Amino acid sequence: MARDRVPDVPDPSPGATDGPGDAPGDRPMAHTDRAMNVAQKLIAAHLVEGEMTPGSEIGLRVDQTLTQDATGTMVMLELEAMGLERVRTELSVQYVDHNLLQTDEKNPDDHLFLASAAQRFGLWFSKAGNGVSHPVHQARFGRPGATLIGSDSHTCAAGALGMLAIGVGGLEVAMAMAGQPLYITVPEIWGVELSGTLPDWVSAKDVVLEMLRRHGVSGGAGRIIEYHGEGLAQLTAMDRHVIANMGAELGATATVFPADDAVRQYLGAVGRADAFEALEADEGAGYDLTEQIDLSSLEPLIARPSSPGNVVPVADAAGEEVSQVVVGSSANPGLRDFAVVAEILQGRQIHPQVSLDVNPTSREVLAYLITGGWLGMLVASGARIHQSGCMGCIGMGQAPATGRNSLRTMPRNFPGRSGTEEDSV
């Protein structure tokens, strides 16, 4: 199927988040006479303590923070303990996307607390059902050149827009909200040059799976991965989101992309054209490590149980029976991902011994699936449609049956993560 058959960037509709106002626009970037790559430019622009020497400790100014409901409660309690009146970041957002099942009063009570805390401290608040934090944040608040830290490991997804986005602990987020720097060890910058064009049926997920096939789940530790090269022209901003998101599975500190025409087009499509600022590596900029990927040589890949690093060609897994298929996560959040599944299933019925679970990644994606006719195709085929949120990715429902294979578009398949102790994902 051609990659451009359906779009992957819906326009946002009003009401996705409730907060004090729009994110500020462009900010001036630091400049230097030395040729710098994108990661170095981001670090230099936010450096408030230390020097950019690999292995040394530095302090970075934090522009934005992200918390979700599984980690945000402790962050809000920490802010209360500090006696903070209002957050001191450019913006901070509290999302509710994890603990969505309400089998007793605990989760809804927690959501009410988070909403009141967001109002008290001056955060934006995104309520249950609005969607997964990472694609929603990219659409609503992400901007090239900014720093973002979040109490969620996949915060790094925002690197798709040319941001320095890092997943950290809750206390670090609370300190940043209070106006304190983020302290990190200067990482190595790993330049990954992309060339060629993606074949049909090969996607951005296969790019990061190829990295995992080569380097495993700890290959990026202590490093920022920066993608560059003429192959970037093949990747939309949402494609880049997939790759940056799964930098977490590589163990990377962060993943960054340049802010180029693809990012300009994306921000224009989501109604925030004024947030764009070009950010690209200087001519002659170098990297601590280098890698090359010829996109033309890639084939569809899959991570077998039970590690994201256990990557093989899909052909090697052909013929294996599955009893559950789950589509929708921060690692495939675009409209196109769902539309392709719907078009494959149009006029067909799901096998009676297979459950297809669909998690729209945002309220906007769900709305576009409805207006585009794709949701009807999925429902007619026998799919189960769930609310917008993390859901099965974190074992919040959708646990697979014992001894059966579950095929998922999610970023992780570590043992038991699905909610079934002896799972096969």
Feature map (PLM): residue ranges:
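Fe-S-dependent hydro-lyases/dehydratases of central metabolism
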Residues: 1-425
